């Protein structure tokens, strides 16, 4: 037989599993399979009697395409739920969307035109908003499905779903009845750009340039008498919001600070002693003399003149006055600041807020300034105060200032009548902090973060002055302005909304909504009634999902097991969900909270379109496939901010290729293996096979532990090392000769195939939650009789096998691996240069010399094994070494020589040996000749 004919006697690899992944084209096929074959539903059915694990989906906003942060979030959730399903948990996934709110309403107004929108009714706007939201839900849904996320995509939850809205109204009613909801005139964040109140979670901070002014306010006689001084005296204040001075009704001091009366060229000025030097330097006052000193509390209840209005201001005391900056005398306008409002309550100060919804000053600000936008009012007030001698210094400063997160424009504090959930006073804060202690936070610092936010958060403003949202279900007696709330009436509203949706609130009159029977029962018949026109904050919408979803969708329950979102949700969805839950039922809606960081570019910079450093999921999928994106999600330590760039994605692609090649090699060499008939018992395996199974067993336990702890980045490192190093670079390389050249059904060959089968089945399950498409492709490439289920996602998790754990093999095989590395380095050199000795390793004879007797004995005892491991034709240990030996790099006292092997090359296995021992096969080595008998 010729060399070519002998090739046909080898058991060469056969598989349809391609080396080139071609994921962008293949992946849609598997999405189609999972959808048509209802794999998600079958997974639930398979585990119907198992313990439930509920991960509740935080709803993304239905506006615009998904971004890389969405992809990270959805894939992390999918990894967890697929793993839990493998482990026998019944793990439903109901995806959701946040569908009300200002961004959608603004987009609709923009599309129809501001002028036309103003002519439209609230109902018309609402219908357009619903259509717009549903359009983006459809688009985003397809984008999420393309990521390989399994879930109940045909029945997602939308916050505009009538069932959800009805539950939200019920929740509002419970919190109202519990005494935590009230209506009050309070300063709130207000966006003039979008003409509505904002919650804290809707505020972002950016650098902003503001005027910084020192203003002197003239003291009245009672203050002069208090300090025993009969010349003109001024209290010096500092502010960066001159437009709020029309609302000034007090100056706040710290009762424990030392204040001084200073004689200066700018008049006799009162300010805190600790701040006097810095303030005078800032103003440019070089000569000053301390005339008198006193405590802040000594001036309480004295008065001063407003600088441009006929108003007397009061000197008051407050703990919020610090010595960090300014003068220690704080301009106080309860209508324009939270601290001012709180201290104003104690002194029964009027809440004046002379600014309208567009940011224009009203008549209350005085004739000089009414009608001016607040930014223009700043200039006009500064000009007037300069002319009247009240301003001592004006300059511009850049500082961090609150902005509307949607319009990116500065916000103001404005006192308006709003609906609030009460945090100041009452027991909600204390109750919530106690509940937080019982929640498991991952990472653990999340507990302190949400706790510290809860300790300091003000009353939550839950009303918005827009049309697209869930109505606040309150009626009024229009003549007395008295609130009308009865649980029976609310129950009827909930029933109507559940049947018709929240548009019914806009469509029907108060009388129609309440109904004849309840009008009579509560003595409302004949009264002129009106409905509340404000809607609820969208954070109340999403914060109601523990009721609107977990109590409504079949198979879900509260508290759920896990909320998983970005770390910004400590002040967002985690926060609002917790507050609404504690305020209604006194408990948490979730047992555990897992947070991930933000996605930055490759250099750690925040992504922005203007910088051109954004990475879109769609672009990654088009070029590399969703599995590469999934692998990135599974490889990063998501607990901190993570990075992505084209280079990082390429690195992921390389790591993926190594895992894929390992799978392909095993599939190619398992084509004739049936585990039911060909499996070899552990006791009959070679030692190297047992070493491989020990490595696999250690990895199995490590991977399971990492999945249980949600530490996917740890398991990825382990899987990648096992596949690329332990398997491809070592074990699979060494057993190639056995697989190709031994008899088809020999114990040696079948043992290697048994190990490979175990490795592949286990490895496929390990990677399936992350590399979902590739795992399914591997599963499909297995012979049908070896697959335990129609889809990898209907299989059971692997079972640990204590028999495979052989830690005693580790030390020996670590030494063997070290020797192989040293020999491989020398073999590589022998292949190179003009005087190359060998073409491949089977051409080689390796000679080893060592003065280390322990090492020498080790090599002698394992000589035949090492020859197989080194993949060489001959190996010897010598007692002396000449100049042709070179030192090993990392093993002391070891010298190595590479020579060409003696004998002739076997035409079948390519090893050098004594040929011609078999007349029928004169060009084969004795082993190959025997195999062919």
From Swiss-Prot:
Spans traversing the lipid bilayer: none
Cited HAMAP family: Ile_tRNA_synth_type1
Main enzyme class: ligase
UniProt: L-isoleucyl-5'-AMP binding residues: 565
Database matches in CDD domains: Anticodon_Ia_Ile_BEm (cd07960)
Tree of life domain: Bacteria
Protein family per UniProt: Belongs to the class-I aminoacyl-tRNA synthetase family. IleS type 1 subfamily.
EC number(s) stated in the UniProt entry for this protein: 6.1.1.5
Swiss-Prot/TrEMBL GO biological process terms: isoleucyl-tRNA aminoacylation
UniProt binding sites for Zn(2+): 906, 909, 925, 928
Cofactor comment text: Binds 1 zinc ion per subunit.
Gene name of this polypeptide: ileS
Signal peptide: none
Organism: Fusobacterium nucleatum subsp. nucleatum (strain ATCC 25586 / DSM 15643 / BCRC 10681 / CIP 101130 / JCM 8532 / KCTC 2640 / LMG 13131 / VPI 4355)
Subunit structure, interactors included: Monomer.
Cofactor: Zn(2+)
Record-level Gene Ontology MF annotations: aminoacyl-tRNA deacylase activity; ATP binding; isoleucine-tRNA ligase activity; tRNA binding; zinc ion binding
Keyword Membrane: no
Domain statement: IleRS has two distinct active sites: one for aminoacylation and one for editing. The misactivated valine is translocated from the active site to the editing site, which sterically excludes the correctly activated isoleucine. The single editing site contains two valyl binding pockets, one specific for each substrate (Val-AMP or Val-tRNA(Ile)).
This protein's UniProt keywords: Aminoacyl-tRNA synthetase, ATP-binding, Cytoplasm, Ligase, Metal-binding, Nucleotide-binding, Protein biosynthesis, Zinc
Protein name (database record): Isoleucine--tRNA ligase
InterPro entries on file: aa-tRNA-synth_Ia, Anticodon_Ile_BEm, Ile-tRNA-ligase, Ile-tRNA-ligase_type1, Ile-tRNA_ligase, M/V/L/I-tRNA-synth_anticd-bd, Rossmann-like_a/b/a_fold, tRNAsynth_Ia_anticodon-bd
Gene3D superfamilies: 1.10.730.20, HUPs, Ile-tRNA synthetase CP2 domain-like
Reactions accelerated catalytically: tRNA(Ile) + L-isoleucine + ATP = L-isoleucyl-tRNA(Ile) + AMP + diphosphate
Location of this chain's protein in the cell: Cytoplasm
Positions of short motif 'KMSKS' region: 606-610
Role: Catalyzes the attachment of isoleucine to tRNA(Ile). As IleRS can inadvertently accommodate and process structurally similar amino acids such as valine, to avoid such errors it has two additional distinct tRNA(Ile)-dependent editing activities. One activity is designated as 'pretransfer' editing and involves the hydrolysis of activated Val-AMP. The other activity is designated 'posttransfer' editing and involves deacylation of mischarged Val-tRNA(Ile).
Motif ('HIGH' region): 60-70
